[in-house]
Amino acid sequence: MKRIAKKKEYTIGRLYILGDEDMEVGVNNRGKSVRTLKNPDQLNRQTYFCDTLEPTWRNLLGVKLPPQLVNESLGRQSSKKARKVVGLTAIPEGSYPVVITKSPRFRRWLPLLVGVPGFSGIRIHSGNMAADTRGCILVGENTIVGRLTSSRATLTKLITTIMAASDQGEAVWVTIV
């Protein structure tokens, strides 16, 4: 997943479907498995799946930022870790395994990102605007500025794709860049 618009009230991204052969598998300094993209050119029209919508992006990892992204009121200071605002913060960049589990809140089977530092219960679900998420990733088509359309149909298609990959023994991860 590549974030393409980090706005004041929301974050828009693009979700791509790649195979294990497109990813470099390694271990980080905490001993956790991580996946990085072998070739950024793989994020293209052929691998594009859908758009995503999340809450406001904050610099939770404390990375160096280009001047146009710096905004202290939004927790966007260069080389300084931001504070998480519960329910209003996009998850940090990284690689997270995905499982499909029954959501008590939504009362249906939904993708769940596992091991997101500082977050719990991060789901991928349907919704149309930033107000529809409390930190989760919404999927759909970004045809209206700051919003998604076709969210339910996109979610159904994504769950089918994840289950098919799992049934074939493939690892299912979301890597956010």
Descriptions of predicted regions:
Residues W173-V177:
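Low-complexity intrinsically disordered segments
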Residues M1-V172:
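Cell wall/extracellular polymer interaction/catalysis modules
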